[in-house]
Amino acid sequence: WSNGEEVTANDFVYSWNRAADEKTAADYAYLFDIIARNYDGSLAVEATDAYTLKITLTNPCPYFNDLMAFPTYFPVYQKDVEKADPDGKNPGKWCQEAGFVSNGAYTLKSWKHNESMVYVKNPKYYDADNVTMDEIHIMLSADDTATYAAYNSGDLDFVDTVPNDEISTLNGKNSDFHIIPNLGTYYVGFNVNDPIFDGKTVEQAASMRKAMNLLIDREFIVENVGQTVQIAADSFVPAGMSDGNGGVFKTDDISYYDADKTGADQVEEAKKLLESAGYTFTDNG
């Protein structure tokens, strides 16, 4: 740990059980569902010695090593957690200010909320000799224009986003501008309890949703909104998702949107679906 104490297997037993506990309300608690449970509800994770964990899974999991590389599986310092939140009412309080104990390459030296963070090299890190930067300053801002201006003025060495209207100017014309792939899907979801579905059968409601799906011009959004070579989604699962066995899940997925159809084809099919749901169209639409 950054305070010099040794990280042991028991730190992981504590941290994983804490993250999986409903009382913690961790966003990614479900990632521990692959681990079996003991009779008392705790995870079937045992520290057989100071450096060894025995983990019992509910079933074979080829991607378990990948799961353990996810931050939710990282250890937290039990003394800090319990000191900051003795009654368990605010599980995240221990890390809401700078100075908490951690075990990464850097420790958080200062944190001005919504403004900046300063990280310093952790001399206790197991591989500290290969950590080349002594200090990192991070600007916190949701304003792309402000961060981009700070970059251009030399106040920042790196920014991970730029204003959309700058993309066409930078892409392919500035050697510092790079587009990095990101695994994800932007989608529209429906509140099926909305009054718009009142009085509709299950089939009619499904037709309405399918029609909206057909009427979204993905290519227009990719080209004019995203502008960074995104791929029009033809499935809920994004391209490049691993299937857990070394393959790509997307290749076996069933597309729900045919990117080869023309816009006119999509509109006509959507109109038929809406008509089947009880909508009528006039010459004016």
Regions found by a protein language model. Give the residues of each.
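Aromatic- and charge-enriched surface segment that lines or borders ligand/interaction sites
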Residues: 1-26, 54, 202-204, 208-211
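Short helices/loops that flank or line small-molecule/ion binding pockets
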Residues: 4-6, 11, 145-156, 172-173, ...
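Surface-exposed binding/hinge segments that line
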Residues: 11-13, 29-83
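Gly/Pro-rich hinge or "lid" segments in bacterial periplasmic/extracellular proteins
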Residues: 69-131, 135, 267, 271-272
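Ligand-site clamp/hinge motif
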Residues: 92, 97, 123-169
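A bilobed periplasmic-binding-protein/Venus flytrap-type ligand-binding module shared by bacterial periplasmic
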Residues: 120-125, 184-211, 224
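Ligand-binding "clamshell"
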Residues: 168-181
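Structural transition elements
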Residues: 232-283
